[in-house]
Amino acid sequence: MKYTDEEKKIIDEVKKYLRELRLINIEKFSLTFEIEDIPSPQSIKYSNEVPGGFSKSKGEQITSNMLRRELLTKRLELFNMELDKFMTLVYLLNAGHRNIIRTYVCSRGYNEMIDTLEESFCISKSTYKREFPKACLELSKYLDMEHRPSLEKLNNMFYESIKNE
């Protein structure tokens, strides 16, 4: 399908919007794994021994990890809020476009996205290439392009909230 220059510009803007959401989603998963790797206070990973005098005491280790977990959780909440705002808009699209957009945002890369679309939704690569621009145009009606999500902006909000506490 042929698109006008204005439509092409809108499609590119929506793609940028979606790429930023993808970055936020990838960072969210990294944070989730990082939080899961923090040992609980009951963990046997904590030791009372101080080998070579370089380790913190058990109490300091536990306190440090609890604070770290709390900060990571706050950052994760910011990312979740941004993604949740967007995902509610996706439900305004038809099912095919919704599946394409959601998979685009939630995949780590192109090949993973194409595989997921084919395996989970029976959407071929050629169908994706044909329908993705249409989905972007439809989605653009609902997006606030003036307030595009940004990983950097969310990180700055997080650092400001820490400073203010």
Regions found by a protein language model. Give the residues of each.
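Short alpha-helical segments used as structural interaction elements across diverse proteins
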Residues: 25, 66, 95, 99, ...
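DNA major-groove recognition helices of helix-turn-helix
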Residues: 128-146
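N-terminal interaction/assembly modules
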Residues: 1-91, 144-165
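Short amphipathic alpha helix immediately N-terminal
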Residues: 93-112
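Helix-turn-helix DNA-binding module
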Residues: 108-127
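Short amphipathic alpha-helical surface patches that mediate protein-protein
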Residues: 36, 105-106, 133
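A short, hydrophobic secondary-structure junction motif
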Residues: 122-133, 160-165
